[in-house]
Amino acid sequence: MFKVVHKSPILLLLMVACSLALVNIVSASEIKARAAVVMDAATGRVLFAKNPDLRLMPASTTKLMTALVVLERKNVSDVTIVSKKASSAPATKIGLKKGDYITIETLLNAALIKSANDAAVALSEAAAGSEEEFVSLMNAKAIALGLNNTRFINPNGLPGTGQYITAHDLAEIMRQAIRYPLLKEILGTRVAEFSTGKGKTILVNNTNKLLWSDAELIEGKTGYTLEARHCFAGAGERETGTIIVALLGAPSRPLLWKETEDLMALGTRVLNNLEEPVVYLTKVDYDTAKVKKTSYRKRSGKKRKRLAL
């Protein structure tokens, strides 16, 4: 059963007074990200949520859905030719040039490790013929997954009117992504080196810095724009299973990493039956957002900046 917590000073005082067992829950409810969800990767069960259905900008976590749709339509060994539109995508990018020959696998590495926007556009054109048609496929995939509060307008996450996601939906997309061995490998890669096919070698570092500091965090995807702030979806292997953490709208990158690790720890406690699952709502956010509530009670379900990281 879920506890639903609405933030208020009186309620917080009562919670602190009621039970020592609630200390961790109160701590987690004070996270600074605007929305967060912790999910059991095996079942889809939500272990903790703050504003899970609040629609926010996804930034480059969008590229997780891009990867899912591409893998449904293309073989990773397929070669595509980079278009002028893809090569002209704004930063962050790897510097693709019009006419470059490049494999789908290389583009996936660039989009997910470096968070390259040019690679994301090239992937969309390779998979659907045009960026616009690919976006339609992304939204159809979201509907098929039951993601009621997600809508994409591009494959890279750059800001635009009508593009949004929720922490719950982002966690579910991450859960789907790690079912692909190739995506698990890419999202857990610290450093990658690849060629564009014209003799140009590119070395990229993963934007997910937890890969260097948390041995149990096996993969993840960052996101940042000025509008979206700092975002992240990641998966961590714990003794009790794999835990998904999704955060949107964190004030800073260091805080994003700290809250990811804190929520991983909380999720582990819930899986170990040391805490109850909690849905935590910040009233001011819900008063100003139109959301479709998700029924959480029924849901089971290698390590080697304007920017969209």
Positions of predicted regions on the chain:
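Active-site-adjacent loops and short helices of periplasmic peptidoglycan-processing enzymes
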Residues: 25-168, 172-181
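Context-gated lysine
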Residues: 3, 7, 32, 50, ...
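Domain-terminus/edge residues, biased toward the C-terminal soluble/receptor-binding domains
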Residues: 148-151, 159-309
